[in-house]
Amino acid sequence: MSRRCAITGKSAMNGHSVSHANNKTKKKFGVNLRTIRIKLEDGSTTKIKVAASTLRTMKKASK
């Protein structure tokens, strides 16, 4: 399974690590994934991987 958010589709992106001397090396910025359980309409539960930013938005929307 890929490291991708199941709801928004967010995945890792590429960039540079920049040192104090301004040397640049390639770096991969990963997604902060969390495994959560959600209840489906039929009453069963399933596990999905969700980005932490998506989880925060979901919690804000449920208030």
UniProtKB/Swiss-Prot annotation:
Entry keyword annotation includes Ribonucleoprotein: yes
UniProt GO BP: translation
InterPro entries linked: Bacterial_rp_bL28, Ribosomal_bL28, Ribosomal_bL28/bL31-like_sf, Ribosomal_bL28_bact-type, Ribosomal_bL28_sf
PANTHER family noted in UniProt: 50S RIBOSOMAL PROTEIN L28, LARGE RIBOSOMAL SUBUNIT PROTEIN BL28A
Family from the record: Belongs to the bacterial ribosomal protein bL28 family.
GO terms for MF: structural constituent of ribosome
Region (Disordered): 1-22
GO cellular-component term (any): ribosome
Organism the protein comes from: Campylobacter hominis (strain ATCC BAA-381 / DSM 21671 / CCUG 45161 / LMG 19568 / NCTC 13146 / CH001A)
Membrane-spanning parts: none
Keywords, alphabetical: Ribonucleoprotein, Ribosomal protein
Name of this protein: Large ribosomal subunit protein bL28
Entries under HAMAP family matching the protein: Ribosomal_bL28
